[in-house]
Amino acid sequence: MTVREGLLHFVLLGILVLLFFVVSDYHDGNWARIMVLAVYAVGYNLLFGYTGLLSLGHALFFATGMYGLALPIQHLGFAPVPAFLSALVCAAVVSSAVGFLALRTSGVAFMIVTLMFAQAGFLLSLYAGRYTRGDEGFVIPQSARIIAGIDFSDPTIRYFAAFFVFAAAYLL
């Protein structure tokens, strides 16, 4: 990375910090969501940009992490930190299994295999609607949004948590 590119990265991050103080609360929430999805895009860029493998099933891993966090909280009564660890384990297991099979292919076959796994995950979440609430989803209880005394339902905390995760992913 050149000095100019590095400077551009930090200017973008500076703009994101300033946006919090300029735009309304509604838009702060939208920007927080955008930064979370940008982390998703950075992961996709790592795969496609460095390996040339075009994955059509990248959302499966995003959903696995989300359900790996939310389901233990909702149905098993996990505290937030063990649920977060559960999400990491679930995402690692699913991505390892899919990667083990998908990386034996390349080109269009890789795209088809990753799409197949993503569709299987999507259908699983729909058919297990009793637990996942299908395409409606569910809301994590307020008590589970407090980690180490920090309330992540607070818009300011949520914005800057999304910002720091995005900044870490973006700068790496």
Q: Each predicted region: which residue ranges?
A:
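Transmembrane alpha-helices and adjacent helix-loop boundaries
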Residues: M1-L172
